[in-house]
C-alpha cells in the first residue's frame, strides 16, 4: 500500500518536479538550482566519511544534503537547530557556512530547551535560519522564535506529516 501511495504522489507531482508551472523567477531558481541540484558539492565526501550517524534513519543523507544546499544558498549569519535531527544534519548545516553562528538545542527537556532557546534568541537578536527538527514542542519553539525572524529568514520544519495535528498546524 505504501508503495502504491508513493507512486501516486510521484505521478501527481511529476509535472512540477523541475519547476514547471512556477512563475516566480526566484522560486524557479531555488527549485532547479538548490532543491533538485544533484552535482557533488565540495564538502559532501568529507562529511560522509566523518562518522555517519544511523540513529534516526528517517533523516536520510539526501535530507542532510538538501539542508547543506539551502544554507549554502541563503548564506545565513545565524542558525538555530532545535530538536532531534540525527547529528549529521547539524554537521552538514554548520559546514555549509563555517562563519555563521550555529546553535543546536537537542536532547533537553522542554522547559530547559525553551529557556536556552530564549537566551540564544536574545543573544543573537535575529535568526537567519531556523531548523525545527523532530521535537514534540515544535509549536512553542516556532512561537518563541517568530519575533526574531525577518523577511530574509529561512525556516525548515522536519516531520510535517508525522501526525495529523502537526500537519494541521503546518
Residue ranges and their predicted role:
Residues 1-129, 135-156, 160-170:
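A short alpha-helical cap/connector motif
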